[in-house]
Regions:
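Short, surface-exposed coil-to-beta transition loops
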Residues: 44, 82-83
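A short, N-terminal "cap"/entry segment at the start of jelly-roll beta-barrel domains
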Residues: 1-29, 33-34, 40, 61, ...
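Glycine- and acidic-residue-biased ligand/ion/polar-headgroup-sensing regions
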Residues: 44-63
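Structural motif
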Residues: 55-56, 84, 94
Length: 103
């Protein structure tokens, strides 16, 4: 992911742990305390997110619109290359998901 700042934020960054990074995929575990964020980034590959815990997320989009998303633990979703956003833990509990990028 390439990061580029869109809006000023006082939030702290989540923890990211690279699990796999090879010629075919990149797998990263993201761990958030409440109100932590990924920071602004653009996805350079198609990707799949699998929620490890329930994930109550606020997604900040480049157009200034925010989207609230709740993903149940164990559920997954897929997105295409080029998505630009900042992901924030909008809940009161820690949240964790695994991102699988397909190179």
């Amino acid at each position: 992911m390439a990061h580029n700042e869109k809006r000023f934020s006082l939030r702290t960054s989540c923890t990211s742990i690279m699990l796999v990074d090879d010629e075919r995929s990149r797998v990263t575990r993201f761990e958030f305390q409440p109100d932590q964020e990924t920071g602004w980034h653009e996805h350079e590959y198609d990707y799949v997110i699998t929620a490890i815990t329930d994930c109550d997320m606020k997604i900040e989009n480049p157009d200034g619109e925010d989207t609230s998303v709740f993903v149940n633990a164990g559920d997954a979703y897929r997105r295409n290359t080029g998505v630009k956003h900042n992901v924030i833990n909008n809940g009161k509990l820690p949240m964790t998901f695994v991102e699988i990028e397909l190179k």
